[in-house]
């Protein structure tokens, strides 16, 4: 299941402000990601609550199977995101797309999941919600921003090497 919205935005000192919403995504990373973009796609994808239930059962009965199942479910949600990107290329053929920039990437706080899901009405439309730690439920879900631009986009600017936090990241 998925949902997306094409939104216009402005960039200011606070971050990226999406028009006709109250959402402002803070940080330099998202500003850099949407540099020279005309608009953005805010998207959310989830594969199923049933996956979460089955994973919990396997974690209690067979951890090896749980590990494999978890990995396969991660691949499945990423493939679902790829399909949404294909759909977007068909719907907006005159635009180049940036890569998927997930909520929580770079210096964009994970707490932005809450306003992001509200803008999409994701809870009601695809059953995607948050826990108190801003983790998505169902777990095998993705939220992301894709920029749309008339100019070709480099896909090289991905990963730790280009992240604003690459010198101070606790995960490196």
Feature map (PLM): residue ranges:
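Long, amphipathic alpha-helical coupling/dimerization segments that relay conformational signals between
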Residues: 58-107
């Amino acid at each position: 299941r998925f949902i997306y919205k094409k939104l216009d935005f402005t960039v200011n000192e606070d971050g990226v402000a999406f028009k006709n919403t109250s959402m402002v995504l803070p940080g330099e990373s998202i500003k850099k990601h949407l540099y020279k973009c005309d608009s953005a796609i805010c998207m959310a994808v989830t594969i199923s609550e049933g996956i979460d239930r089955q994973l919990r059962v396997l974690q209690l009965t067979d951890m090896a199977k749980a590990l494999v199942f978890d990995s396969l479910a991660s691949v499945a949600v990423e493939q679902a995101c790829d399909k949404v990107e294909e759909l977007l290329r068909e719907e907006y053929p005159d635009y180049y797309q940036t890569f998927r920039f997930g909520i929580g990437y770079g210096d964009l706080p994970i707490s932005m999941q809450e306003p992001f899901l509200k803008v999409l009405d994701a809870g009601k439309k695809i059953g995607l919600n948050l826990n108190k730690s801003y983790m998505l439920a169902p777990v095998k879900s993705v939220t992301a921003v894709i920029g749309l631009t008339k100019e070709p986009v480099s896909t090289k600017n991905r990963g730790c090497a280009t992240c604003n936090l690459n010198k101070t990241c606790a995960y490196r």
